[in-house]
Design a protein with these regions (language model features):
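Long, low-complexity, charge-biased intrinsically disordered regions
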Residues: 1-260
């Protein structure tokens, strides 16, 4: 109902062209300057983004990345920003029947999407119900204004998302390995909270939670016994991750970028 109400408020409940993705991946938004900036009274940009932010935090993780980008321009929106926000609203309306599905068999394994039915059934039997898995990723210097990277995290339980993160990293990462390490740190901190929550609910995780990561250097970094010279400036995060691996909180599994 919230999606329908939002779309009707901005005349987007019957779009002529339904977008397949929330935001054009080739779109690079930047802060408006001077006469480019549109007053809030004329465009209601903050109101649109605020409504989308609510949806992205509660039930629509698929728009989290797009809304995160839009929220960076609340004080200086241009016509381009308004069009991008309207596109996200249009997307949420045309995909309003989509939802998060949790399965009783507890399958989180991405391999199941790339095998035949018999293999899928066999792998399903190997999965334990109520076992979390997660994905961590980052785009290096994705923000063109600050050159900061964006952390992306997804946590699945019984085949459906239960938690997600899409936010700008607080510092500028100097390499993909550093950006991915920062993202994994955020992921593991979230996993620590969720593991404690599941324990209180009587669903304690008996195994380390899998973190799928597509950067081989970041995966190898936590397995190195010695200190990496290239990672001296973020060694605290590396040692934190090493400690969490040792304590059985999580374990890395490399996955291809295509599957990530």
């Amino acid at each position: 109902q919230a999606i329908i109400k939002l779309a009707k408020a901005y005349g987007l409940d019957d779009p002529k062209i339904a977008p397949h993705v929330p935001m054009d991946p080739n779109l690079k938004l930047k802060k408006g300057e001077g006469n480019e900036i549109i007053p809030e009274a004329e465009c209601s940009y903050a109101a649109m983004v605020g409504s989308l932010l609510y949806l992205s935090l509660t039930c629509r993780p698929d728009i989290a990345a797009a809304v995160g980008v839009l929220s960076r321009f609340m004080s200086c929106p241009t016509a381009e920003h308004v069009d991008a926000a309207r596109r996200v609203i249009s997307y949420t309306y045309t995909t309003r029947e989509l939802g998060i599905v949790h399965r009783r068999d507890g399958v989180n394994n991405p391999v199941l999407a790339f095998c035949n039915h018999e293999d899928s059934l066999e792998l399903s039997r190997q999965q334990e119900p109520d076992l979390m898995t997660s994905y961590a990723d980052a785009d290096l210097a994705g923000d063109i204004s600050t050159r900061r990277s964006t952390t992306s995290v997804c946590v699945l339980l019984n085949g459906g998302l239960v938690a997600w993160i899409s936010r700008l990293q607080p510092t500028v990462a100097l390499s993909t390995t550093e950006a991915e390490t920062i993202a994994t740190t955020d992921c593991v901190k979230l996993l620590m909270h969720l593991r404690l929550l599941l324990r209180e609910l009587g669903r304690e995780q008996q195994q380390p939670t899998i973190v799928y990561e597509d950067n081989q250097a970041a995966v190898k970094l936590t397995a190195m016994p010695e200190q990496s010279k290239r990672a001296k400036h973020y060694q605290m995060k590396v040692h934190f991750l090493k400690g969490m691996v040792k304590n059985g909180v999580y374990r890395y599994i490399w996955i291809s970028t295509h599957d990530q």
